[in-house]
Amino acid sequence: MSANLLKESGPREVFCGLTSIVWLHRRMPDAFFLVVGSRTCAHLIQSAAGVMIFAEPRFGTAILSERDLAGLADAHDELDRVARELLMRRPEIRTLFLVGSCPSEVIKLDLARAAERLNEELQGRVRVVNYSGSGIETTFTQGEDGALAALVPLLPASESRQLLLVGTLADAVEDRLIHLFSKLGIESVRSLPPRQSSELPPVGSGTTVLLTQPFLTETARLLRDRGATVLKAPFPLGAEGSRRWMEAAAADFHCPEASVRAVLDPLEARARIALAPHREVLAGKRIFLLPESQLELPLARFLHRECGMDLVEVGVPYLNREQMAEELALLPDGTTVVEGQHVERQLDRVRAGHPDLVVCGMGLANPLEAEGITTKWSIELVFSPIHGIDQAGDLAELFSRPLHRRQLIHSALHPQASDHPVHA
């Protein structure tokens, strides 16, 4: 593949890494995420999670006041006090994540030192770690990368042979994948993050890592430093990507090819059947992916190769060429891939390209819809269970649905131009 790789910089339109707390706190019910930030940070997380604060969710915000920001108060002492009160009130917490934000980074609040102080005080009763969820230089999915990277140094050492799935998956999807790996002959499969933060998987030279998400660059680097082997494979989105992803693990564990085909061939055939009605809607349509989630390259590969869509432009917030090499190789020749964002210029290219569908952030969706451009929220793809060969049809439906909706609206507004009028 010879993609047209470009890079641009300028004003961006993305969520910050605090958003990842929404799925991480659901994944690890014995963990608590304490954001050190402003009231804006608190409103963002509460709104994104859809959880009222009186329901006692497993996240909260230590709000920096104007005195903190002006340097008139000792924010470190105040943070220690808030953390102690939280742990006394919530004794079920086993891991406390101190999460940095834009305001805490601006005033140079040392959360690493705060975590160290609290760990010394708690003496192992609760593990305290820290990472940055700031959106100053990152996009929202990198919050998970920061959280997992903070856990890697704490993983126990082991040379035992095992497969480690890295990246948050829906529980049902993860259970299904572990079952399929077992049928392939891979019995020892662990996950990071685990379902309980106190049950961290081991890592060492016998560990083979399969990344489930493309945005875990720092986590992958740290796992390599611990001796693990990180496999190169497309990511498990769609039938083709999921199969190649599982085949990479099967090859590393020397699973018999006949056994691999016996397991995966029927699944792929069933996935193709599930894809068929959505391909009828999507084939030949033009799609423009704006940069936000870092899922853009795997999605572009899936939408082109399995759904027949034409790629106008594929935007990515950041491009790790080594980690994304397998995805880049599967894109059609000449695909325009733009790293970074100058949102005004990209919107100009959207209007000039006349795409049938635009994948973008929530902040851009309504203005584009008002211009008559059909959109898909990129954040919905992060919250939906789309990984694995069994989910290929559901993934395609996420893109065919807005086009179908647009057609219904058009038919209702212009019944004389439609052979199939919509009745209330």
Curated annotation (Swiss-Prot):
Q: Which cysteines are joined by disulfide bonds?
A: none
Which EC main class describes this enzyme?
oxidoreductase
What is the reaction catalyzed?
A: chlorophyllide a + oxidized 2[4Fe-4S]-[ferredoxin] + 2 ADP + 2 phosphate = protochlorophyllide a + reduced 2[4Fe-4S]-[ferredoxin] + 2 ATP + 2 H2O
EC code:
1.3.7.7
Gene3D superfamilies tied to this protein: Nitrogenase molybdenum iron protein domain (3.40.50.1980)
Q: Which GO terms describe its molecular function?
A: 4 iron, 4 sulfur cluster binding; ATP binding; metal ion binding; oxidoreductase activity, acting on iron-sulfur proteins as donors; oxidoreductase activity, acting on the CH-CH group of donors, iron-sulfur protein as acceptor
Quaternary state and interactors:
Protochlorophyllide reductase is composed of three subunits; ChlL, ChlN and ChlB. Forms a heterotetramer of two ChlB and two ChlN subunits.
This chain belongs to the protein called Light-independent protochlorophyllide reductase subunit N
Q: List the taxonomic lineage.
A: Bacteria, Bacillati, Cyanobacteriota, Cyanophyceae, Synechococcales
